[in-house]
Amino acid sequence: MAKSADIRPGITLACTECKERNYITTKNRRNTPDRLELKKFCPRCGKQTVHRETR
């Protein structure tokens, strides 16, 4: 049987403006095979920016 880490891998989210990696989360590969893009607060920029999944 597949482990939960295979289906829900850990990913990091990086700010698109300053490229700092601010957030760590998991995602379900079956539901979202493409890269995540979430609007989150970046402490370095001091505002909400788009954070993209990095590998």
Curated annotation (Swiss-Prot):
Show the disulfide pairing: none
Recorded GO cellular component terms are:
cytoplasm; ribonucleoprotein complex; ribosome
GO MF, one example: structural constituent of ribosome
**Pfam families documented for this protein:** Ribosomal_L33 (PF00471)
A Gene Ontology annotation in the biological process aspect, one of them, is: translation
Q: What UniProt keywords apply to this chain's record, in alphabetical order? A: Ribonucleoprotein, Ribosomal protein
Q: Which family does it belong to?
A: Belongs to the bacterial ribosomal protein bL33 family.
Listed name of the protein: Large ribosomal subunit protein bL33
Gene designation: rpmG
